[in-house]
Amino acid sequence: LVFRLLMSYLYENYIYPNKLTNRMKITLIRAEKESGKEALSTLEADALIKKLKTETKAGHVSTLRAILPQLEGTCAQYEHIDKLPRIYPAVEYSRTQEGERRMKNYNGLVQLEINRLSGIAEAEYVKRQAALLPQTFAAFCGSSGRSAKIWVLFALPDGTTPKLESDAALFHAHAYRMAVKCYQPLLPFAITLKEPSL
């Protein structure tokens, strides 16, 4: 009963009720090994989700999943790991004239991670469980094939998101803690707790 009341309160006050916007832009950042530079790009959420469903010609994700068991317990890492971008769902970043990264928009997406799964079957189970809650924006398998990511969409009571980076960081930390409390009871695997950051 307490869980249902909490979910009802969150859904009505902090989570976009049926206002999922796929126009929001998600940031992808890739660190280039040779130059040491950071390549930043953005994609609309629906385009990114389509892209995650299909692998590129290079097949870096399939190769990573195949080689990962051989790398366990060693200091070695996948040689093309730099080809896989880090995805920042919470914010749309842009560059200043000086080349510094700055927040352009805060999306209100909180990412929960469930790591150390045995494989794709457990990741698929996590995705099905996450789909039970209406505030789940997306859920997908991680690049290793042994993790799952859940994106939960939060907003202020008026349906907007914070505009200043400092306000967004505080809101995001609070939203992350609430998301963990809501989703953990649905999952037989522990959510990997992280320091919430944009």
Residue ranges and their predicted role:
Residues 105-107, 134, 145:
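Short connector loops at helix/strand junctions that flank enzyme active sites
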Residues 26-35, 98-120, 155-198:
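DNA replication initiation modules
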Residues 68-71, 75, 130-134, 179-187:
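Hydrophobic, Leu/Ile/Phe/Ala-enriched alpha-helical segments that form helix-helix packing faces
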Residues 47, 125, 178:
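Short Gly/charged-rich anion-binding patches and loops
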Residues 136-139:
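Short acidic amphipathic segments
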Residues 119-134:
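Short amphipathic alpha-helix segments
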Residues 2-108:
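DNA replication initiation on ssDNA origins
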Residues 142-157:
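Short, conserved phosphate-binding/catalytic loop or strand-edge motifs used
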